[in-house]
Amino acid sequence: MTRSALLSVTLILGALTAIAPMSIDMYLPGLPTLGREFHAEAGTVELTLTAFFVALALSQLLYGPFADRFGRTAPLYVGLILYVVASVACALAPDIYTLIGMRFLQASGGCAGIVIARAVVRDLFESREAARMFSLMMLVMGSAPILAPIAGGYLLV
């Protein structure tokens, strides 16, 4: 694989892996605003995070077997479409309870990138190269907790 192709693969897989973490950290600065806008208590607003984490954990258990059975592309597209549709539904949620449900679906779709990106690395690279790719992907994903709250705060302004 050429150096430019390797860089492209690293950035794409890193971005797929960073989707769900970005959706957590970008969202945090807006929690107080959500409470005010939906006239909801802090505990109820925090359920949006709980729903996200539960779906993120449980859905990863499904994408692995689906990706093994149906290939990498179809489950990834299903997950990304679910993520985008749920994200739009989150933006249009009329109440906090709809938002909680949509955050659950958003995480269910967003975790496809986490699982399938790792599977693709195992498909494309041998053990030593795979370890290097995993570390590079984590470098890209590691920027999410740094950049996402800044972006989320900027979106609120």
Indicate where each model-derived feature is located.
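Extracellular/periplasmic helix-loop-helix junction of adjacent transmembrane segments
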Residues: G30-L58
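Residue-level signature of mid-helix packing/kink "hotspots" within the transmembrane helices
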Residues: D25, F53-L61, P145-I146
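Conserved MFS/SLC helix-loop-helix module at the cytosolic interface between two early adjacent transmembrane helices
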Residues: L58-Y97
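Cytoplasmic helix-loop-helix junction between adjacent transmembrane helices
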Residues: M102-V140
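Helix-loop-helix hairpin linking two adjacent transmembrane segments in secondary transporters
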Residues: T98, L136-V157
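Interfacial helix-cap and linker-helix signal at transmembrane-aqueous boundaries
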Residues: L34-G35, F66-A67, A151-V157
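Residue-level signature of the transmembrane alpha-helical cores
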Residues: L16, V78-L82, A86, M102, ...
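Cytosolic juxtamembrane N-terminal segment immediately preceding the first transmembrane helix
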Residues: M1-A20
